[in-house]
Amino acid sequence: MIRRVLVANRGEIALRIVRACRDMNIDMVAVHSEADADGLWATMATRRVCIGPARAGESYLSIPNIIEAALKTGCDAVHPGFGFLSENPDFARKVAENGLIFIGPGADVMARMGDKSAARAAMTEAGVPVVPGSEGVVDSIEAA
């Protein structure tokens, strides 16, 4: 059972996740940059952790900082929210490698579905109807 979740996002996305977890009696850890310390999602969470400076590349996109925050605060799971690292298979893999639950699709699924050609092939193989289009990677403008 999940007892504590770290939300690896900010703003209204993080706020929505914080509220949902609160409704389910799950402790919530919010991460924030130095500039976002007073963000509503951070103040409403059970705990909050600063993960770096205002620049997103040094905070919200820093996989090591987010993993460290989750481990230091005793989280069971990480919710990526939307954008930032939510579709990054390396992030999902690192979360799992550190013994945490990634709330979202697995790294392998993300990697496969993130490649349109591979996703189309997987859906066709599974018998899912796909819209007409190329059967593989288009290698020239003329072919497109």
Locations of regions flagged by a protein language model:
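N-terminal beta-alpha lobe that positions the nucleotide/phosphoryl donor
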Residues: 1-144
